């Protein structure tokens, strides 16, 4: 079958031919319809320090997808041939304390699809049936293919009560923009997103965010005054991993504020901890999606009118995958979809 693989320990991803994966007793075989390129895939393409330590070579990559069930393991129940599915990219062990306690998103033995084992940038994918999620008929293939990153946004945004709150989102990548849109959709008062990338800030404006702020040109405190805010942000969603953005968030949080962190900062990032202590801030780390509460919330948000369509900016045939990666690497894109049909 046709697949995109990391074939060499150097920059790039290559089209290759690999065997169709074998179906296990508890697995589903999925014929891929559409995939989306993640920031993680760009890291793998660039072959940065993290990728060099993490990614086995050669391996099929990719973990954002939608497809159709074409094979079912003999122990699997609840699925049928033809079901349209996406899937949770974190494969968990099932026997650690968190897995047995129903907190599978906190599994200490997580294996990543397209990171630690073969991924979805291929005509067919095999995953455990436990990880598959049926897509409702009224959700398009394009939107279903980005459920993985949308799930990161939903998990982060819904970590705290947002109704009537003022929310700061730092980082206007696709996940940050989707998190801001979720916050607005579920009843936040003011949702402010910050970045220095004007293309992506404009995408945020198209998504109906209260205010998209280029912090290289505008002062966040001035924006807060403009919005009539007098006590700081109630909730912070840190999506950038940029130390200056996190420091600004700490500066502008209200006392008792709550921060969810999805962005990965440098390991040696320094902050003024007195602001955390004396403001009584609560900081929560976010990794992946809650299984499968986040997935049900994703479907419900779209079905209740959340419009994510502006975040998908580029669509290519899989044979033009290089154009897709070029768009993602340029920073001048939202989500990029690759069609396998």
Swiss-Prot record:
Molecular function (Gene Ontology), one example: L-threonine 3-dehydrogenase activity
InterPro entries in the cross-refs: ADH-like_C, ADH-like_N, ADH_Zn_CS, GroES-like_sf, L-Threonine_3-DHase, NAD(P)-bd_dom_sf, PKS_ER, Zn_alcohol_dh
Pathway stated in the Swiss-Prot or TrEMBL entry: Amino-acid degradation; L-threonine degradation via oxydo-reductase pathway; glycine from L-threonine: step 1/2
Reactions this protein catalyses: L-threonine + NAD(+) = (2S)-2-amino-3-oxobutanoate + NADH + H(+)
GO cellular component, one term: cytoplasm
Coarse class of the protein's main subcellular location: cytoplasm
Family assignment from sequence similarity: Belongs to the zinc-containing alcohol dehydrogenase family.
Protein name listed in UniProt: L-threonine 3-dehydrogenase
Natural source organism: Escherichia coli O1:K1 / APEC
Gene name for this UniProt entry: tdh
